[in-house]
């Protein structure tokens, strides 16, 4: 039976990975290549002024609607959260959203029967309705698809494997669109032109939309959702206004978001204009595929290189160094002209560090959760982690608007070729493509370098302070014990190993009982189980510690290793979420002991009763040095009369 289960789940991973491929292929053509079709092919009445006016209006409509959609996103999330039916929590939205969005996007790659030439105003209204409908249904599909990952399995290892398949599918899906777009469009076009024609773009869009449609139905029919307590305890979806409020209160989150905003606008504009450069400046649209292939591999290399750089350099150093490297690429771009090798060098220098910049910003935003918790007294994890996707969408929206306008100003609209672009048009284009993004990157460097002080060391200090003060939120918890007339409580160990008195732990804070009395275990395995029925009240983002408030009134902090916050979650797995109720024996955390030892850290697992002052005494039920199994009773706590 186990082999059959594994076989089925491997199939599920493949299907989910294929779903990610279709999802990102769809997003790639929506966010980048629909604009190219609109500016270069859609409007062709022979009246240049009318065509340019339509391009300008349509691209502005897209920009405005994409910004409006940011405020609709929270309602989409809430609608998905409230969905309860037999097919599942997420799969119906993946199928319905994928179907509707694919059909409508394909319609947008047509001239809607020449409607714009008959009545421009009606065309604009119809286009706006179709676009916002398509965008909303795609958001339903996108949110549903990525949110369903935890529901596919309760096994954390399987989640990691499935997520890896999804990331691989996502990289392939988004990257291959860039590789194939111009060769495919030109191949399917009826006319032999350097930019293709309406038929070529429609057939290419048809292929991508079919992939997106089939992959959505594949996920809907080929995966199964598992019900669990984690999903029942899912936090509410975050609204845009709540995000702004969180930014105003958390200065490190605010500055990281601002730096990422300027950076995001810059890279989105330059990235969106690269295909225009190959097409209208160089006259070599097919060569854009070479850049896309290079970027796929460089993205994978950059991601694997990041852990090495982050150990040798500070976050500010990595962030500034990456952006300076990108500025060097922009500088080479300005003198590259039509030299393919110089252009490829410039474009790869610009694209290579982007994954590393993303990871630096993600680390700061993630660490700002604990920073805000210490500063404000409450934890806004969902708010903080909603900031980056919001900025990504906003940057993409601004990019769409700018690209449409610069295409008109530079003369890169319907019927244009590389030879028809004037010197003035090239100058306007290059100023927008190079000077403006360079300015955005310089501003981002300035903000990040001057305002961000949330280093890994600072974050470790914050986590340590939160561990010291965590108990103050749960004073007088033994009142519920007194009501039950309980005079003593047994405290079990959450992990197997050798018992160590707390005073012998190699940490003065724990050893002195500053965080409360308790005991420690030299672990013999890496599974942390709930020692009693309890509610999870704290799960650190580094997954090295968990705080429980027991149904019996005991407030317990379980801390894996000493100095392990520095590992930033590497080698640790969390099976629970804040607010989740667990029963004795449920698995809370898991860690890979060799990771801790290879980092030169102490792997001792420490348990402190942070409300130990509410008990009169603690008696040992086992001898120090004795080997115990998980959930064996270690201490007996006596309540106050």
From Swiss-Prot:
The keyword ATP-binding does not apply. Gene3D superfamilies: Glucose Permease (Domain IIA), MFS general substrate transporter like domains. The chain crosses the membrane at residues 25-45, 57-77, 93-113, 120-140, 168-188, 201-221, 253-273, 288-308, 317-337, 342-362, 394-414, 429-449. It is a multi-pass membrane protein. It is found in: Cell membrane. Pfam families: MFS_2, PTS_EIIA_1. One of its GO terms (cellular component) is plasma membrane. Its main location: membrane. Residues 1-506 are annotated as: Permease. GO terms for molecular function: symporter activity; transferase activity. It is an enzyme of class 2 (transferase). GO terms for biological process: phosphoenolpyruvate-dependent sugar phosphotransferase system; sodium ion transport. In the N-terminal section; belongs to the sodium:galactoside symporter (TC 2.A.2) family. The PTS EIIA type-1 domain may serve a regulatory function, through its phosphorylation activity. This is Raffinose carrier protein.
